[in-house]
Amino acid sequence: MANDKLESLIEAAFEDRAQINASTQGDVRDGVERALLELDSGKLRVAEKQAGATGPDAWKVNQWLKKAVLLSFRLNDMSTIEGGPGGSSWWDKVPSKFAGWTAAEHAAAGFRSVPNCVVRRSAYIAPGVVLMPSFVNLGAYVDTGSMVDTWATVGSCAQIGKNVHLSGGVGIGGVLEPLQANPTIIEDDCFIGARSEIVEGVIIGQGSVVSMGVFISSSTKIIDRATGKIHIGYVPPYSVVVSGNLPGKNLPDGTPGPSLYCAVIVKTVDAQTRSKTGINELLRD
């Protein structure tokens, strides 16, 4: 089935989703399964950057693929998922990406999956990726050479570029709950510091460095200290971002009000920054 026909099938099924359940068979089930397999293999992705385009509008979102992911929850019953600690199992609707894999499949995939990492089926992991004990949700895309460090989470349908480092405990938001229009996107060559959270469809531009403990949502003000320009939902390429505060409005009695959180672009990435945040090729062999 051609992709345009598959898209039309998924769109129609999503409009009629109230009628879809675990007993649904035929074209709808086959179409959703095909979409998930294409996502899992990286042949299709929920969002893709347009050639030559720049800025926050450079990404095209394939909403129909996100809808296919959502439909899969209605189509699939709960079942046991093997591989729990001590020989136990889990109870879920989404199998592991690694279910049924042998050494041959792991070698062909070309990425490292450290014990206790979790990747749900329909997430794509490119060759050269390193997955520490982390969680990658369904529909996500993690590109070549990236590292997902310990306890980091890549949310549903999130897009992680090439040579990205997601430090320990980083959270990259998903799109399924609460339902978001666009996925969170981390472009190529970015470094996201430990325990930072990037959510709600925010785009981090290529080569940017986000410091430890920075929280950016779709409503967070991102202020360029050099120019005073305020960005919402988008960090320009090669920015160095830290946590900051905006002065609050006075309270009714005239006393200073509480300050409000913001993110601050303190400078553009330079050689010194890169030396501290560069990819270690020894870990990618």
From Swiss-Prot:
Keywords: Acyltransferase, Amino-acid biosynthesis, Cytoplasm, Diaminopimelate biosynthesis, Lysine biosynthesis, Repeat, Transferase. One of its GO terms (biological process) is diaminopimelate biosynthetic process. It is an enzyme of class 2 (transferase). One of its GO terms (cellular component) is cytoplasm. It catalyses: (S)-2,3,4,5-tetrahydrodipicolinate + succinyl-CoA + H2O = (S)-2-succinylamino-6-oxoheptanedioate + CoA. It comes from the Bacteria. Pathway: Amino-acid biosynthesis; L-lysine biosynthesis via DAP pathway; LL-2,6-diaminopimelate from (S)-tetrahydrodipicolinate (succinylase route): step 1/3. Its main location: cytoplasm. PROSITE patterns: HEXAPEP_TRANSFERASES. Its EC number is 2.3.1.117. One of its GO terms (molecular function) is 2,3,4,5-tetrahydropyridine-2,6-dicarboxylate N-succinyltransferase activity. It is found in: Cytoplasm. Belongs to the transferase hexapeptide repeat family. NCBIfam families: dapD, PRK11830.1. HAMAP family: DapD. This is 2,3,4,5-tetrahydropyridine-2,6-dicarboxylate N-succinyltransferase.
